Amino acid sequence: HQGETIEEHQAKVSTMWAGFSQVAARNPNAWIRDALDATAIRTPGKTNRMVSFPYPKLMNSNNSVDMASAIIMCSVAKARELGVDESQWVYPWVGTDAHDTYSVSERDNLYSSPAIRIAGQRALELAGLGVDDLDFVDVYSCFPVAVQVAAAELGLSLDRELTVTGGLTFGGGPLNNYVMHSISRMVELLRDNPGKKGFVTANGGFLTKHAFGVYSTEAPKGDY
């Protein structure tokens, strides 16, 4: 619907994915830490087979990984009781979720998501933030379409960094546990950058189930 040729689309997507690869190179927990350029990502080869034209392996989620992550959530009172230093605290400000129809054939089109638009914008509204106020963003990145649709619905530029892990291709795609990794990495970055704001998105199904969270070392002004 954007009027691109296949070659133009491949170039755009591979450039975006090269940016994800650069982030993975800086993430000590990423699965593929070799920084790959756009040409390497879009060119099929022995280690980059064509999965579903025009998307080779390096444009798809990588679930051949051995990864685990965990977070600890507790009240302020419990954190103090346990002696957790406040420099390690990261507050969840907002959480929202929404659901598109399961049946892909019943959707108005294949390039939009009302659920992302409604729940994502509601999360930012509840947090009192706009997209330009977000210092770190991780958009669920199983495939390029997921990032492009979410960015369009949320008003996020594809020119900014849209991952903190390197995404499901390079950071690693441990099936349903990926967002635990993106939240964990977001916590690390926010601890290193007190006062900054982070935004994490999640997805399940065929771009069907969506969830959003805003995080910061600063306490939220209202209740979670």
Please give the residue ranges for each predicted region:
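C-terminal catalytic subdomain
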Residues: 171-172, 176-224
